[in-house]
């Protein structure tokens, strides 16, 4: 059975992410031990909360270089919600530097009349990399579940894999580059479409992406 390591760094309840991956046919191991992360077939970086505490927790566990090495090794890697945002260089939300694996920043939604911030609830993805294996067997504009006040703004739009529109603002909702994929929505809370995405990720592990 495919083993997926879920990085434990005290940022959110990991149970729902693990349950979603297990429903997709994987075995999960929750750990912050580098040996467990490298031994797994793939790694998931989840996260709920604020940018600065997330980075502080990763640094306190000496996990920043480990995450860099995991991604550089070609191991399939999925970031979810805050796990997408901290892949970038910095955030308007705080002062801590991010992982810097992707160039760009994390920005807050601009206020608009009638616009709810945080963006909380269901929204439709527009797939900017429609051929991405992560999107297989999805509807053309699938509905996914979001809870966020901030969004990523990649310096290189070629990594953008999907967008959403909230009010008048169209922003990046997913990125993909080689073995690295990350999403702003919560697939584990997104009903059938979310479970399909997790199943697609598990399937990719069995057919690795060449870097």
From Swiss-Prot:
Keywords: Amino-acid biosynthesis, Cytoplasm, Glutamine amidotransferase, Histidine biosynthesis, Hydrolase, Lyase. InterPro entries: Class_I_gatase-like (IPR029062), GATASE (IPR017926), Imidazole-glycPsynth_HisH (IPR010139). GO terms for biological process: L-histidine biosynthetic process. Residues 3-211 form the Glutamine amidotransferase type-1 domain. It is found in: Cytoplasm. It comes from the Bacteria. It holds the Pfam family GATase. GO terms for cellular component: cytoplasm. One of its GO terms (molecular function) is imidazoleglycerol-phosphate synthase activity. It catalyses: 5-[(5-phospho-1-deoxy-D-ribulos-1-ylimino)methylamino]-1-(5-phospho-beta-D-ribosyl)imidazole-4-carboxamide + L-glutamine = D-erythro-1-(imidazol-4-yl)glycerol 3-phosphate + 5-amino-1-(5-phospho-beta-D-ribosyl)imidazole-4-carboxamide + L-glutamate + H(+); L-glutamine + H2O = L-glutamate + NH4(+). Pathway: Amino-acid biosynthesis; L-histidine biosynthesis; L-histidine from 5-phospho-alpha-D-ribose 1-diphosphate: step 5/9. Its EC number is 4.3.2.10, 3.5.1.2. The active site is at residues 81, 186, 188. PANTHER family: IMIDAZOLE GLYCEROL PHOSPHATE SYNTHASE SUBUNIT HISH. IGPS catalyzes the conversion of PRFAR and glutamine to IGP, AICAR and glutamate. The HisH subunit catalyzes the hydrolysis of glutamine to glutamate and ammonia as part of the synthesis of IGP and AICAR. The resulting ammonia molecule is channeled to the active site of HisF. Heterodimer of HisH and HisF. This is Imidazole glycerol phosphate synthase subunit HisH. The lineage of its organism: Bacteria, Bacillati, Cyanobacteriota, Cyanophyceae, Gomontiellales. The gene is hisH.
